[in-house]
Amino acid sequence: MGKKLVMAQKRGETRALCLGVAMVVCAAITYYILGTTVLPLYQKSVWTQESTCHLVETNIKDQEELEGRKVPQYPCLWVNVSAVGRWAMLYHTEDTRDQNQQCSYIPRNLDNYQTALVDVKKVRANFYKHHNFYCFSAPQVNETSVVYQRLYGPQILLFSFFWPTFLLTGGLLIIAMVKLNRSLSVLAAQK
């Protein structure tokens, strides 16, 4: 009976130890992936200063108005605001500026032009309802653009690193409990 209990205990310890090591390895892989994808985007984001933006004007540009340039196949909302004592171009997110520097907002549904136009008009109406709103500006003096919503802010970074940290802590606790259990069983066997 005692030998069966020791064998079952060893198998359970081995399984728990493998679980703990697997959790630590998964956490390390996740840290690596997040460190190479999310962290550089967070460090690249220059819009760190939260400020109040005041709406100056909005305009919906269609294909006809953008002659001579790369013409987007969707209606383009252009928003000009006053922020931190200077005029600036408002972009919905950091990615909006990278996709098209002429547009403040790019609609979600780009397949249907009329649906995209309705979406752009709805966003424009929201700007007219709320003339003052919070935005993010760059601390550099020569920056002429502001961002309405940060995709890569500190909250996203904290949320991204929470689960791998939880996984790493859980794995280390399981490994520590198995080691503690082994040392206590050795001490009990010596008495």
From Swiss-Prot:
UniProt keyword list: Glycoprotein, Ion channel, Ion transport, Membrane, Transmembrane, Transmembrane helix, Transport
Sugar-bearing residue positions: N80, N142
Protein role: Regulatory subunit of the calcium activated potassium KCNMA1 (maxiK) channel. Modulates the calcium sensitivity and gating kinetics of KCNMA1, thereby contributing to KCNMA1 channel diversity. Increases the apparent Ca(2+)/voltage sensitivity of the KCNMA1 channel. It also modifies KCNMA1 channel kinetics and alters its pharmacological properties. It slows down the activation and the deactivation kinetics of the channel. Acts as a negative regulator of smooth muscle contraction by enhancing the calcium sensitivity to KCNMA1.
Subcellular location: Membrane
GO MF annotation: an example: potassium channel regulator activity
PANTHER family linked: CALCIUM-ACTIVATED POTASSIUM CHANNEL SUBUNIT BETA (PTHR10258), CALCIUM-ACTIVATED POTASSIUM CHANNEL SUBUNIT BETA-1 (PTHR10258:SF1)
Membrane disposition: Multi-pass membrane protein
Transmembrane segments: 19-39, 156-176
Cytoplasmic side: 1-18, 177-191
Tissue-wise expression: Weakly expressed. In brain, it is expressed in a few discrete populations of neurons that also express KCNMA1.
Name of the protein this chain belongs to: Calcium-activated potassium channel subunit beta-1
Subunit structure of this chain's protein: Interacts with KCNMA1 tetramer. There are probably 4 molecules of KCMNB1 per KCNMA1 tetramer.
Post-translational modification: N-glycosylated.
InterPro entries (UniProt xref): K_chnl_Ca-activ_BK_bsu (IPR003930)
Main location: membrane
Pfam families the UniProt entry points to: CaKB
Membership in a protein family: Belongs to the KCNMB (TC 8.A.14.1) family. KCNMB1 subfamily.
Gene Ontology terms: cellular component: membrane; plasma membrane; voltage-gated potassium channel complex
Organism from which the protein derives: Rattus norvegicus (Rat)
